[in-house]
Regions:
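Short coil/turn linking the two alpha-helices of tandem helical-hairpin repeats
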Residues: 10, 23, 50, 67-74, ...
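Short, charged, low-hydrophobicity "junction" segments
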Residues: 12-21, 134-148, 264-265, 323-329
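Internal alpha-solenoid helical repeat scaffolds
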Residues: 40-237
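Extended alpha-helical scaffolding segments used for macromolecular assembly and cargo binding
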Residues: 1-103, 109, 316, 328, ...
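Helix-coil-helix junctions within alpha-helical repeat/solenoid scaffolds
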Residues: 54, 63, 85-89, 127, ...
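Flexible, glycine- and charge-enriched loops at secondary-structure boundaries
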Residues: 12, 32, 76-79, 116, ...
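Charged, alpha-helical scaffolding/interaction elements associated with membrane systems
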Residues: 28-29, 133, 320, 379
């Protein structure tokens, strides 16, 4: 209201200040639709101000603030336009601090839409400037987004290395500071550390980082941070096969996205929750949640998790006996993973295709399992390597090749036991028992 009256009185400076304050307040409580409305009005007000370096700096700041609320709403097309405009403004006035900020968010945008090479380039440029400026907020943001990109590419070792640096930079009270981001980067870094370490089978470390993310988020009671904390814990349990522990955390994360109007944020939750439901026989529920999420993921929103969602849906279709659909979806997952250079999900899709082929085409299944295993070994994806050994062992058992079956099943059992993957260990032990 104050901004409205200031605007009508052509007190544009005051109107801008009021709108920025209102937008920040709405953003702080995750009222992103309200924040967007404030920042869009602020952009209109800026057009009435005389052109100067200070006005241009404000124009960058408002665009970046607007981008912060558009992302949880999944409005990606608007975001890239804002980033283009903000980068041009920062370059024009030689503002390196703001340029680094824009470049780091550009890296995040490219991660979101599955263009990781472009994202890495933008992220490295942002980090280089941040290091030169010795700016902790800029270093933390650029490094986190680079960690996200490495995770997406299946380079889990690189993701872990850079994300652990972010955690080390933000001890004690700094862990609770947002540093200009939507939630504390200490929460974000721990969430993706949990994802990355879980993919390598380091579940104890993954769960520890996930629990830390949730603890920091709970202390602030902030929806965006809470979502990340719950999905971190739930995803690790799901990848481990601890479905009883995974489902409550993931269901809570999904509720947060719905209750807080963050429709663009439920991609990883849907993938892992659907997988968890499938493992305990709730196949219809699994299909429903994954199909709903898939429909949304293919709209103008996040593409980053689409390959993972497709892998999960294909596996659930297989569990439900929908073989033809499973193969179609898994083939799409493989194609998209390869196009987006998501090597971890490429290996996962090949494993799912092996599981599908094992029903009717043993020779093809063997090739799929071996290809998936080779790539998973290269990437350090120990749980997936174990799944491939289990698949090969079952395949050889059905073919009457007891010796090879024994070798692969024993390897799977050893790996599952070392990683404390009890759900999968019991499956493998049952198959070994069938050889007697």
């Amino acid at each position: 209201r104050l901004a409205h009256h200031a605007g009508r009185g052509e007190l544009w400076d005051k109107a801008l200040g009021y709108l920025e304050q209102a937008g920040a307040k709405s953003f702080g409580r995750s009222a992103h639709q309200e924040a967007v409305a404030c920042y869009e009005q602020a952009l209109d007000v800026l057009r009435h101000l005389p052109e100067s370096a200070e006005t241009q700096r404000k124009a960058i700041d408002v665009r970046m603030a607007l981008r912060g609320s558009l992302f949880p709403l999944g409005q990606l097309t608007r975001i890239i336009d804002l980033l283009d405009e903000a980068e041009a403004l920062a370059a024009a006035i030689g503002d390196r601090e703001r340029l680094a900020l824009v470049l780091s968010r550009r890296a995040h945008y490219f991660w979101t839409v599955g263009e990781s090479r472009a994202g890495l380039e933008a992220g490295q440029r942002a980090l280089s400037i941040a290091v030169q400026l010795d700016s902790l907020p800029l270093k933390a943001a650029a490094s986190f987004f680079l960690g996200q990109l490495h995770h997406a590419r299946g380079d889990y070792a690189a993701a872990i290395e850079i994300l652990e640096k972010v955690v080390a930079w933000l001890p004690d009270e700094l862990a609770f500071d947002r540093l200009g981001m939507t939630a504390p980067p200490a929460v974000f870094a721990r969430t993706w550390l949990a994802f990355s370490r879980a993919e390598t089978g380091a579940f104890a470390e993954a769960l520890a980082r996930g629990a830390e993310a949730l603890r920091i988020a709970e202390a602030q009671d902030h929806p965006y941070g809470l979502y990340h904390g719950h999905v971190a814990v739930g995803a690790v349990h799901a990848l481990k096969g601890d479905v009883v522990l995974a489902t409550p955390a993931l269901e809570r994360a999904l509720r947060i996205t719905r209750e807080s109007s963050m429709p663009g944020m439920d991609r990883p939750t849907v993938a892992h929750l659907g997988s968890a439901y499938g493992l305990i026989g709730r196949v219809e529920e699994a299909s429903a949640v994954l199909e709903a999420g898939l429909g949304e993921a293919e709209g103008p929103r996040s593409n980053a998790f689409l390959p993972l969602n497709l892998c999960a849906l294909a596996h659930v279709y297989l569990l439900g006996g929908r073989i033809v659909e499973a193969e179609q979806v898994a083939t799409r997952a493989l194609d998209l993973s390869q196009r987006q250079e998501q090597r971890g999900n490429e290996a996962r899709a090949m494993w799912v295709l092996g599981e599908i082929a094992a029903r009717s085409a043993p020779a093809e299944a063997e090739g799929r399992y071996r290809s998936a295993r080779a790539l998973a070994e290269e990437l350090g994806m120990q749980p997936l390597v174990a799944h491939c050994h289990l698949g090969l062992g079952k395949l050889y058992r059905r073919a009457g090749n007891g010796q090879q079956a024994q070798e692969h099943l024993t390897t799977a059992i050893t790996m599952y036991r070392e990683m404390e993957m009890r759900f999968w260990l019991e499956k493998a032990e049952t198959d070994v028992g069938g050889l007697a």
